[in-house]
């Protein structure tokens, strides 16, 4: 994480900007679309607008151990050494009058100010200049710390200046100095709401506190794996589980790097061509998708097996009947594929619009280089790439620089996504979609002026965007909206695929034994939405369809009085109510509960339902909670699960 000074790499980048030693470790766009962010990192950590937070004295300047920093509650951020000069020189004339111009402390302070003015700028990336900046900064820190320790007048001078910089609440102008100081930094503080549109560093999905690192760089790979390699060398662990492998620049190359290290450092007997290190990857496979055979791994973390087994316990022949029941109860038909498409677009609009803006501007710059494409507008290019990602059938493609042509698998996914996007957008010029398709596949005429590097730069960004959009759009949105049979809404699963036959299961297991015999056979993980027991209960509902139909009809009649109007609509809506009833069927305890345990159970159901409706993003969300809808939902749950006399539920 990057939320504390413990991450010395990130701290270094915030202090030293693009010229930091560790700047290359992070995927930061130092020349983003917004000019005010040039050579800066956007830090969307504030709870309110920047100006409001500043004038509420929530951002505080501090002196600490020979340097200065700012704090925002528990967050601590470094200040660039060159910016310390403004703090130290403020009211310097008064200090000189107090001590005299020839005083040793004054001469030392002036010498420190001179040293700060000669520090190489943060934009400087020449290795010798960078080394000089770090060396001289260290010397200045020690000198300043010693001066403040030895001279109480200088100490008082610094503390008084810090107090002045921190402003006076109610006097807006008193914060001008702190504002100017913050504007000099290699970061820009902003409200958390700004992140979705303007963040300029790659993250783990849309989690601002988890900055992505560039493991494709050899030095970053080696440094970031130092602890992991020590654990493996000591025999504390004998294998690795690679989380979110699709977020990597080039998953196959990364896995090869791991195995190359293991082959050199962990000599051991191997069976045939088996890799040196046992590695499982968290790879969510789409319908018909296979784990790439070229990856040096033992298999996946088992989501594919989990859903294969779960499907055995769902009556496939009851799909149409359960679909009709669901449609009738909620009062509308919800085709799953359309819902996924809309959910992915919602994520791109609400959580990841900055990534889409970057892709759109990349396309625009590339199209401007050729007269055949220059008339494609920025808006239409951004629209096209958004639609292609929304229609992308799997998490990502694996186009790389070391292949002359894309693999058939990747080409098929891209062609399919573009074809679907065209069908959904008949009013958008089809040539724009063709341009994006040919750029992704490396089929543009070299005479256009587009280089291989141009193509790879765009493809890389595209491939590292499709995965997070799929994950957030499907697992964290559509799975909470499409409630036909919620036991099928599992990580790596496809709720539109209603059950599996025994024959299909055995065929899949035979293929698994032949291709990936050591792949994990998981039935639940830390990421699953529900435990095996909850899924098993809900899986039975298609077998009890008539009883289930009568039960929910009866419950809906009984509980209709507990629904309330929120913005002229009943709350909770019928879809959330259907989810609630299935959740109770799956989670209702088998043992008798005393009053305390029952209250704990009701509270857990209540919290789960709040989480579910926020993930669904239909009436409320994590970004913009709707207190009235959530309160109505909680009242509904509490009323239904009340132990009062006369509650027939």
Q: Where in the sequence are the language-model features?
A:
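Acidic/aromatic-lined carbohydrate-recognition and catalytic surfaces
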Residues: 1-196, 234, 244-322
């Amino acid at each position: 994480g990057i939320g504390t000074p413990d991450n010395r790499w990130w701290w270094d980048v915030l202090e030293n900007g693009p010229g930091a030693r560790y700047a290359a470790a992070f995927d930061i766009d130092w020349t983003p679309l917004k000019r005010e962010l040039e050579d800066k990192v956007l830090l969307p950590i504030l709870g309110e607008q920047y100006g409001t937070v500043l004038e509420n004295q929530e951002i505080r300047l501090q002196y600490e151990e020979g340097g200065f920093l700012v704090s925002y509650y528990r967050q601590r951020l470094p200040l660039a050494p060159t910016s310390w000069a403004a703090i130290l020189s403020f009211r310097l004339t008064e200090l000189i009058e107090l001590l005299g111009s020839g005083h040793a402390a004054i001469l030392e302070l002036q010498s420190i100010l001179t040293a700060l003015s000669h520090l190489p700028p943060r934009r400087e990336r020449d290795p010798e200049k960078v080394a000089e900046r770090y060396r001289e900064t260290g010397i200045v820190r020690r000198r300043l710390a010693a001066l403040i320790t030895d001279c109480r007048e200088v100490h008082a001078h610094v503390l008084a200046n810090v107090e002045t910089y921190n402003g006076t609440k109610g006097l807006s102008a008193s914060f001008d100095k702190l504002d100017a100081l913050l504007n000099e930094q290699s970061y820009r503080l902003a409200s958390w709401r700004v992140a979705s549109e303007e963040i300029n560093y790659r993250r783990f999905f849309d989690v601002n506190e988890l900055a992505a690192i560039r493991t494709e760089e050899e030095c970053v790979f080696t440094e970031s794996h130092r602890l992991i390699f020590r654990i493996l060398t000591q025999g504390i662990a004998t294998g690795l589980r690679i989380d979110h492998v699709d977020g990597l620049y080039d998953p196959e190359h990364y896995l090869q790097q791991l195995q190359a290290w293991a082959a050199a450092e962990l000599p051991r007997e191997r069976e045939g061509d088996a890799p040196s290190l046992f590695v499982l990857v968290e790879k969510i496979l789409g319908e018909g998708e296979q784990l790439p055979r070229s990856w040096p791994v033992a298999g996946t973390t088992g989501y594919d097996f989990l859903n294969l087994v779960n499907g055995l316990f769902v009556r496939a022949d009851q799909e149409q009947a359960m679909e009709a029941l669901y449609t009738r109860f909620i009062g509308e038909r919800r085709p799953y594929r359309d819902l996924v498409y809309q959910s992915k677009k919602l994520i791109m609009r609400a959580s990841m619009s900055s990534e889409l803006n970057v892709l759109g501007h990349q396309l625009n710059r590339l199209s401007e280089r050729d007269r055949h494409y220059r008339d494609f507008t920025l808006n239409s290019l951004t629209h096209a790439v958004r639609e292609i990602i929304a229609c992308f059938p799997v998490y990502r493609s694996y186009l790389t620089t070391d292949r002359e042509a894309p693999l058939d698998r990747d080409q098929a996914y891209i062609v399919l996504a573009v074809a679907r996007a065209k069908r959904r957008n008949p009013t958008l010029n089809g040539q724009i979609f063709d341009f994006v398709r040919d750029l992704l596949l490396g089929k543009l005429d070299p005479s256009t002026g587009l280089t291989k590097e141009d193509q790879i730069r765009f493809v890389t960004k595209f491939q590292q965007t499709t995965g997070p959009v799929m994950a957030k759009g499907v697992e964290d949105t559509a799975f909470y909206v499409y409630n036909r049979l919620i036991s099928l809404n599992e990580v790596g699963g496809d709720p539109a695929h209603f059950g599996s036959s025994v024959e299909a299961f055995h065929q899949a297991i035979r293929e698994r034994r032949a291709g990936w015999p050591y792949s994990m056979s998981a039935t639940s993980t830390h990421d699953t939405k529900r435990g095996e027991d909850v899924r098993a209960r809900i899986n039975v509902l298609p077998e009890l369809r008539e009883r289930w139909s009568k039960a929910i009809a009866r419950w809906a009649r009984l509980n209709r009085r507990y629904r309330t109007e929120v913005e002229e609509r009943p709350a909770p809506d019928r879809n959330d109510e259907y989810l609630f009833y299935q959740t109770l069927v799956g989670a209702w305890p088998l043992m008798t509960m005393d009053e305390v345990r029952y209250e704990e159970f009701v509270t857990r159901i209540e919290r789960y339902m709040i989480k579910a409706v926020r993930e669904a993003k239909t009436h409320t969300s994590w970004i913009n909670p709707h207190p009235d809808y959530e309160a109505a939902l909680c009242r509904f749950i509490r009323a239904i699960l009340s132990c009062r006399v006369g509650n027939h539920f």
